[in-house]
């Protein structure tokens, strides 16, 4: 039942998204849902996976008490289970939604430490990347306490299992099921020749391990946290770990992972 369930809607700048968001808002208000952007129970994204990622980061520090639901205004996405033609089904699903049956996906904790002792901590749903603006990046890569390699190339991407189908896949990474509690590190255009060597392939790193990148001192590093990009200098280290933080999706019409992969990259199989 509804009982005044608190929701909030987030869309993108497209006219179609604005139109669908407005229509869904009217339906939800008529059904006595409470609109609360400060402490929502469910955040509904109207757009694509990028809109859902933006919504997640808007509520990054409330993930322990917020669930998400995606309405796609184009085609089925990895984080969006409904289309713009399913608005009444969305409302019905929200009525029946049970928090105890939410679907949980792991997030990667990213801790950036600077040479002056300052630190920032973020969580990512898809991936985090590090690269330099226009020159070769050099950095030591540690797996837990072991110095694994000295990387040279354009950059590195560290992804979650759900994020393995995003940027990670485009740079040759493996697709990993979300039930596999692991991180994946993939190289971005690494240098491999008789002088410089890296592993040259993606790696699946176990849940108990950490990945630490210690980049060479430079002042033009670019870090991404999902779709958010920041420029930094004086970076001492970047540590990636699975600390148990998850994102929760309302279990309304959840599409199985391999079905999502097949529909997104293969299409109909005859």
UniProtKB/Swiss-Prot annotation:
**Organism for this UniProt entry:** Lactococcus lactis subsp. cremoris (strain SK11)
Indicate whether Calcium appears among the record's keywords.
no
**Which protein is depicted?**
NAD kinase
Name the catalytic site residues: 49 (proton acceptor)
Q: Name one GO molecular function term.
A: NAD binding
Q: What does this protein do?
A: Involved in the regulation of the intracellular balance of NAD and NADP, and is a key enzyme in the biosynthesis of NADP. Catalyzes specifically the phosphorylation on 2'-hydroxyl of the adenosine moiety of NAD to yield NADP.
Q: What is its main location?
A: cytoplasm
EC top class, as a word: transferase
Where is this chain's protein located in or outside the cell? Answer: Cytoplasm
HAMAP family xref list: NAD_kinase
Q: Name one GO biological process term.
A: NAD metabolic process
Which NCBIfam families does the record associate with it? Answer: PRK04885.1
């Amino acid at each position: 039942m509804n009982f005044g369930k608190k929701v909030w809607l987030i869309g993108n700048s497209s006219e179609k998204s604005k139109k669908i968001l407005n229509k869904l808002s009217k339906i939800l208000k008529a059904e006595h849902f409470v609109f609360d952007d400060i402490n929502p129970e469910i955040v509904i994204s109207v757009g694509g996976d990028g809109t859902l990622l933006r919504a997640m980061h808007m509520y990054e520090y409330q993930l322990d008490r917020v669930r998400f639901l995606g309405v796609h205004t184009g085609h089925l996405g990895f984080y969006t289970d409904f289309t713009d033609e399913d608005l009444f089904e969305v409302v019905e699903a929200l009525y029946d939604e049970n928090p105890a049956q939410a679907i949980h996906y792991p997030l990667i904790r990213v801790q950036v430490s600077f040479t002056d002792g300052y630190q920032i901590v973020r969580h990512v749903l898809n991936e985090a990347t590090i690269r330099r603006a226009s020159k070769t990046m050099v950095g030591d890569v540690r797996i837990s306490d072991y110095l694994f390699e000295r990387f040279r190339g354009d950059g590195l991407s560290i992804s979650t299992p759900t994020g393995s189908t995003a940027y990670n896949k485009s740079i040759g990474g493996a697709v990993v099921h979300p039930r596999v509690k692991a991180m994946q590190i993939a190289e971005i255009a690494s240098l491999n020749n008789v002088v410089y060597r890296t592993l040259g392939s993606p790696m699946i790193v176990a849940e108990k391990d950490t990945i630490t990148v210690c980049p060479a001192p430079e002042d033009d590093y670019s870090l991404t946290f999902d779709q958010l990009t920041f420029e930094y200098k004086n970076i001492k280290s970047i540590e990636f770990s699975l600390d148990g933080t998850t994102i929760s999706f309302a279990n309304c019409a959840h599409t199985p992972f391999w079905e999502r992969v097949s529909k997104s990259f293969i299409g109909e199989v005859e």
